[in-house]
């Protein structure tokens, strides 16, 4: 890869981008920002992010919460929602002084960044996109052929990676559907050539936004279904190592097997707990 310092990719403070409403699924009636800080604080007091006492796998809790409470929330409840309105982030003005892109271009591109697809991902198969994320196919990741993988533009992340994983089974086409809608919506904004979007153009942009977010939500639903199945399977695995009572697990081999089952259960429960999207009203 061409990056050794993550700050060269982005210095964004994600806590400030978290869902600002109450998160009832976490104790204390906290906001999204407070939940994220709380998880990180508690993870710091554990061994490798795993809390054996309460069965929390913070590596999963933090990553999955961030994907829903920051990435999906920001894209579909902010950049592709109110920021596509006529009176918000106008297209006939630079995003800020000195910027060579408009407010609408910036907002649309921000949402694409949260989606997490490689810039050339739409030219690849689902398996290629999946293997790129798994670092099993770095040749196809290297779009410009410079012998390096650019982590900002040539790698898949987060829900885009999930989509590729589901699509490679051949029954869905989430990755390309969402990515193409991003490309087509961006083209409408580009074709306006720095002028205000017409009502027809804005309707077209919002139509693509609905395609993006409705399919993105399906990706999340698929993940919930997957993790729910994993939780059930791991409950059965835990039962099998308990012999009816966890305190009766005897012998180092049995104890190790039991602890491994508990860790898997905690991992997938953590995945399931905060895989769901944050509340939003963009579809209303």
What is the meaning of each model-derived region?
Residues 1-276, 280:
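Mature extracytoplasmic or organellar-lumen-exposed domains after removal of signal/transit peptides
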């Amino acid at each position: 890869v061409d990056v050794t310092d993550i700050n060269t990719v982005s210095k964004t403070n994600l806590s400030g981008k978290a869902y600002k409403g109450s998160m009832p699924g976490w104790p204390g009636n906290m906001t999204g920002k407070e939940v994220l800080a709380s998880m990180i604080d508690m993870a710091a007091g554990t061994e490798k992010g795993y809390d054996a006492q309460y069965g929390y796998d913070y590596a999963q809790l933090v990553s999955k919460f961030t994907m829903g409470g920051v990435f999906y929330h920001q894209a579909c409840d902010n950049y592709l929602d109110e920021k596509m309105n006529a009176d918000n982030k106008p297209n006939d003005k630079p995003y800020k002084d000195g910027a060579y892109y408009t407010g609408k271009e910036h907002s649309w591109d921000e949402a694409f960044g949260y989606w997490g697809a490689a810039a050339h991902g739409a030219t690849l198969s689902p398996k290629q996109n999946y293997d790129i994320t798994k670092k099993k196919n770095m040749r196809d990741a290297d779009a410009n052929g410079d012998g390096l993988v650019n982590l900002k533009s040539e790698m898949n992340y987060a829900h885009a990676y999930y989509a590729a994983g589901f699509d490679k089974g051949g029954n869905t086409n989430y990755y390309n559907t969402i990515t193409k809608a991003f490309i087509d919506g961006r083209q409408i904004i580009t074709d306006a050539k720095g002028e205000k979007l017409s009502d027809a153009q804005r309707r077209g942009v919002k139509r693509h936004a609905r395609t993006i977010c409705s399919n993105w939500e399906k990706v999340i639903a698929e993940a919930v279904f997957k993790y729910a199945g994993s939780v059930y399977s791991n409950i059965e695995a835990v039962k099998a190592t308990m012999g009816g009572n966890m305190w009766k697990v005897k012998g180092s081999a049995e104890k190790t097997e039991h602890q491994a089952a508990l860790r898997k259960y905690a991992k997938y429960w953590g995945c399931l707990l905060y895989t769901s999207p944050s509340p939003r009203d963009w579809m209303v």
